[in-house]
């Protein structure tokens, strides 16, 4: 969850699926690790820069794993609020892929 604390996440482990609040990200960590590594290997010798999109999973831990794999140069997000969450969690190379509209958001 994008704004869940670790205690809340830990309390959900082992619960039956029908008892989980949605949306909920359920993930096979081994498969996820293999996919992240495969994508990093693919981009390792390419003349292109990988910038995974945060909106796909909205998970700080996965975003960090994607960057730690070595081939990503930063993270992409769709909204200013997502960028703020990423920045608050130590990400410093963030691309907002959509327009930021309105003075209030521009000042943020």
Task: Describe the residue ranges of each PLM region.
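N-terminal glycine-rich anion-binding loops that anchor highly charged ligand groups
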Residues: 7-12, 31-62
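Active-site mouth loops of central-metabolism enzymes
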Residues: 21-29, 49-53, 69-75
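Active-site-proximal beta-alpha core segment in soluble small-molecule metabolic enzymes
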Residues: 53-108
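A generic short-segment signal for beta-strand/edge and adjacent turn/coil regions
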Residues: 18-22, 43-45, 64, 89-92
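Generic N-terminal amphipathic, Lys/Arg-enriched alpha-helix
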Residues: 8-27
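Short, acidic/polar
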Residues: 4-14, 79-83
């Amino acid at each position: 969850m994008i704004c869940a604390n670790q205690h809340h996440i830990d309390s959900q482990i082992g619960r039956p699926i029908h008892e989980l609040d949605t949306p909920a990200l359920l993930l096979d960590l081994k498969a996820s690790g293999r996919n992240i590594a495969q994508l990093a290997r693919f981009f390792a010798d390419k003349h292109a820069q990988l910038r995974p999109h945060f909106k796909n999973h909205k998970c700080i831990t996965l975003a960090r794993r994607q960057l730690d794999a070595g081939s990503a140069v930063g993270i992409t997000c769709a909204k200013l609020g997502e960028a703020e969450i990423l920045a608050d969690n130590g990400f410093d190379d963030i691309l907002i892929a959509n327009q930021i509209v309105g003075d209030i958001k521009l000042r943020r």
